[in-house]
Amino acid sequence: MQRRNKPEVLAPAGNLRGLKTAVDYGADAVYCGGKAFGMRSAPKNLSLEDFEEGARYAHERGARVYVTFNVLPRNNEVEAMREYLGKLKDTGVDALIVSDIGVILMAKQVAPNLELHVSTQAGVTNYQAANAFYELGARRVVLAREMDLQAVRDIRARIPDDLDIECFVHGAMCMAFSGRC
């Protein structure tokens, strides 16, 4: 992971058309969910074929595609997740956005070609947590939405240079800590 001098413009997409539109209008990367295993799973999300087409489209234009895979799975979902990951890894997407430690370990085994980004749902609020996720293989942590700029600076100073930090600069705020409502 290269240290950037400018922020990455990361846009959401709920379908293939939205992904292409985000790329066409200058997004450096797009995050989107599949039809399963994202916190906002919905029928309109992307199919495996959509991910393949979307990743190809984005890469041809210098952009990246991240897949939200940030559910907290139940026991009866684990094997289906493993199977889905086995298919997702070959679509050309760049990274998984994850929050569950078991899913992180599964992704490292099943889809080692995909970068791991730790979701804001993991509630990372300190450098110790960021470093722990780095040791597990994460290359980016999405900090809790409640972090102020000084807290972000403090974390940045105490984590490896090749661990990216992502921060929300807009959007919904939970009344409690994000992911802990």
Residue ranges and their predicted role:
Residues 1-181:
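Non-catalytic helical/linker scaffolds that mediate oligomerization, partner binding
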